[in-house]
């Protein structure tokens, strides 16, 4: 990597420019404990010469102290960063690494295999385009393989690469490879995973990771890095699916008022008719500002159109009441607006979730108080069986009915990851205690929860005022 280091040091601007126009692919590695996830990533980084000299020197020292590969460099130590990870030889936290090839940029999420760290794996999978599921060639499909495959499918990852690892320990047997591939194919069909790819690898020795291996002449496919380089994950932005969660209102002077945020989906042009939700107010896009001095006199900062995931400022032709948490969409393609949602919830806190308790539900830029009205069923992610429960514990995944104190504009998660997902925040500790995906939004009148207006006493109003003035972090609403 010394030559690469010198190149960066001599021409940092050129190095950045070389990579800025490459498309980005995010992938995660998952599988059972000790299947070699961290070793695979370490090998990929090492063989693609993306390890800096100081990182390599540190890893060599740690390898002598904690390594399990004798005199050889323990590739897993290039990724496992926590002291407890190195000492125990396992992955606990989600480790992110960046590297690039001639064709593409990559962000890797190395996720833990242990069941007690399921919430960490969900975090890593939430932004991934591709999942690499490792299977030990000696053990085949295990319970944790089934669990991770379920989570990968639940989070909408459409491409799954099955890396059958430690093939060197079974003499690169084609029979073993075919047996495991067939078994996982049946599992993928059961879950509804559409795009699966199978590669025989040895992460420790580097076979079929970056370069083709001579020890598997019967395998005609691409090595792992070649497959990641050539995989098509692009999706053309659909103009009609425009979603723009408003992050904040920008008013730098009396002559300008714009609405800032990152486009979550679709494409917008100046002159488009838009609707602000949940208020339902309509107007047209006057200008789209994407850089530089934010004034309507500075035409160089304007663009005729913008698309996901660009961060822009939008101005409107009419004075419309828009605030943080609102969503701007095309008038011809409105998402459903409701306060009653069907969700899949992953509970991430040691304190159990009990229906009826109020939490803050953070979806995109909006934060709305809400609660779980009913748990439909909990999924046993090892057997895929549904269980009836009254509350959720750490790492539980369940189908629930969630009710909010006010309606929001929402999409199903399978349609839009950003506007169809949310986190659950404890209102007292401010801890993130859960994460979820919107499965359905109630449209039928009888399904929408009616939150009737309540008549408050003078004492209740006084208490409300006291809480708002002295505990603003509670974000208590005005009554």
Swiss-Prot record:
It catalyses: sulfate + ATP + H(+) = adenosine 5'-phosphosulfate + diphosphate. CDD domains: CysN_ATPS (cd04166), CysN_NodQ_II (cd03695), CysN_NoDQ_III (cd04095). SUPFAM superfamilies: EF-Tu/eEF-1alpha/eIF2-gamma C-terminal domain, P-loop containing nucleoside triphosphate hydrolases, Translation proteins. Pathway: Sulfur metabolism; hydrogen sulfide biosynthesis; sulfite from sulfate: step 1/3. GO terms for biological process: hydrogen sulfide biosynthetic process; sulfate assimilation. GTP binds at residues 31-38, 110-114, 165-168. Residues 110-113 are annotated as: G3. It comes from Sulfurovum sp. (strain NBC37-1). Belongs to the TRAFAC class translation factor GTPase superfamily. Classic translation factor GTPase family. CysN/NodQ subfamily. Its EC number is 2.7.7.4. Pfam families: GTP-eEF1A_C, GTP_EFTU. Heterodimer composed of CysD, the smaller subunit, and CysN. The keyword GTP-binding applies. Residues 22-238 form the tr-type G domain. GO terms for molecular function: ATP binding; GTP binding; GTPase activity; sulfate adenylyltransferase (ATP) activity. NCBIfam families: CysN (TIGR02034), PRK05124.1 (NF003478). Residues 31-38 are annotated as: G1. This is Sulfate adenylyltransferase subunit 1. Residues 89-93 are annotated as: G2. With CysD forms the ATP sulfurylase (ATPS) that catalyzes the adenylation of sulfate producing adenosine 5'-phosphosulfate (APS) and diphosphate, the first enzymatic step in sulfur assimilation pathway. APS synthesis involves the formation of a high-energy phosphoric-sulfuric acid anhydride bond driven by GTP hydrolysis by CysN coupled to ATP hydrolysis by CysD. PANTHER family: TRANSLATION FACTOR (PTHR23115). Gene3D superfamilies: P-loop containing nucleotide triphosphate hydrolases (3.40.50.300), Translation factors (2.40.30.10). Residues 202-204 are annotated as: G5. Residues 165-168 are annotated as: G4. Keywords: ATP-binding, GTP-binding, Nucleotide-binding, Nucleotidyltransferase, Transferase.
């Amino acid at each position: 990597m010394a030559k690469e280091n010198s190149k960066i040091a001599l021409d940092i601007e050129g190095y950045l420019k070389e990579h800025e126009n490459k498309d980005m692919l995010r992938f995660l590695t998952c599988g059972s404990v000790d299947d070699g996830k961290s070793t695979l990533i370490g090998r990929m980084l090492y063989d693609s010469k993306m390890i800096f000299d100081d990182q390599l020197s540190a890893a060599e020292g740690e390898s002598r102290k904690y390594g399990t590969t004798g005199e050889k460099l323990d590739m897993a130590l290039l990724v496992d960063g926590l002291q407890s990870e190195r000492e125990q030889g396992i992955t606990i936290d989600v480790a992110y690494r960046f590297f690039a090839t001639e064709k593409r940029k990559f962000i890797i999420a190395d996720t833990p295999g242990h069941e007690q760290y399921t919430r960490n794996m969900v975090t890593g999978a939430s932004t991934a385009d591709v999942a690499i599921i490792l299977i030990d060639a000696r053990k085949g499909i295990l319970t944790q393989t089934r669990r991770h495959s379920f989570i990968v499918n639940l989070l909408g990852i459409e491409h799954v690469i099955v890396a059958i690892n430690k093939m060197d320990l079974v003499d690169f047997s084609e029979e073993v490879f075919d047996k495991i591939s067939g078994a996982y194919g049946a599992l993928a069909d059961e879950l509804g995973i559409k795009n699966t790819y199978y590669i025989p690898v040895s992460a420790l020795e580097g076979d079929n990771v970056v370069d083709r291996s001579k020890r598997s002449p019967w395998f005609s496919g691409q090595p792992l890095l070649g497959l990641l380089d050539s995989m098509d994950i692009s999706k053309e932005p659909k103009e009609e699916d425009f979603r723009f969660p408003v992050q904040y209102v920008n008013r730098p002077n009396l002559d300008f008022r714009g609405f800032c945020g990152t486009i979550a989906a679709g494409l917008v042009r100046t002159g488009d008719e838009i609707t602000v939700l949940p208020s339902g107010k309509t107007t047209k896009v006057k200008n789209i500002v994407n850089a530089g001095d934010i004034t309507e006199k500075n035409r160089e900062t304007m663009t005729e159109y913008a698309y996901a995931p660009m961060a822009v400022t939008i101005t409107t032709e009419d004075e419309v009441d828009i605030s943080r948490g609102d969503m701007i969409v095309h008038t011809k393609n409105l998402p459903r607006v409701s306060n009653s949602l069907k969700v899949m919830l992953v509970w991430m806190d040691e304190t159990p979730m009990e229906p009826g308790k109020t939490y803050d539900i953070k979806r995109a830029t909006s934060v709305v108080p809400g609660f779980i009205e009913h748990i439909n069923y909990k999924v046993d992610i090892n057997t895929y069986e549904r269980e009836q429960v009254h509350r959720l514990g750490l790492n539980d995944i369940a189908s629930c009915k969630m009710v909010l104190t006010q309606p929001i504009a929402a999409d199903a998660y399978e349609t839009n990851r950003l506007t169809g997902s949310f986190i659950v925040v404890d209102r007292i500790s401010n801890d993130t205690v859960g994460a979820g995906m919107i499965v359905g939004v109630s449209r039928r009148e009888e399904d929408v929860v009616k939150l009737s207006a309540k008549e408050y006493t003078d004492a209740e109003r006084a208490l409300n005022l006291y809480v708002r003035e002295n505990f603003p972090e509670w974000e208590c609403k005005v009554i």
